[in-house]
């Protein structure tokens, strides 16, 4: 019998080379609140976080580049979504 998969452990094995000079995802200045709620629930890496004051915090550094937020929020919540420049981004290690 196998043990349950711990997603946090699996994600922790991946390697991220973050491009600090050029974020590949940028939120709109005034994003649609409903769209942000969808992104909070849909992002598999959990990068959209609701704060105690109701604001949403986002950090592209742990992005899996799956495109979920691009599909769900490009016109409503995101100003820009593109893949990171060459040599940057996620390196999947399939821990």
Swiss-Prot record:
<keyword id="KW-0813">Transport</keyword>
<keyword id="KW-0479">Metal-binding</keyword>
<dbReference type="GO" id="GO:0005506">
    <property type="term" value="F:iron ion binding"/>
</dbReference>
<keyword id="KW-0004">4Fe-4S</keyword>
<comment type="similarity">
    <text>Belongs to the bacterial-type ferredoxin family. FixX subfamily.</text>
</comment>
<keyword id="KW-0249">Electron transport</keyword>
<comment type="function">
    <text>Could be part of an electron transfer system required for anaerobic carnitine reduction. Could be a 3Fe-4S cluster-containing protein.</text>
</comment>
<keyword id="KW-0408">Iron</keyword>
<protein>
    <recommendedName>
        <fullName>Ferredoxin-like protein FixX</fullName>
    </recommendedName>
</protein>
<dbReference type="GO" id="GO:0051539">
    <property type="term" value="F:4 iron, 4 sulfur cluster binding"/>
</dbReference>
<dbReference type="InterPro" id="IPR012206">
    <property type="entry name" value="Fd_FixX"/>
</dbReference>
<keyword id="KW-0411">Iron-sulfur</keyword>
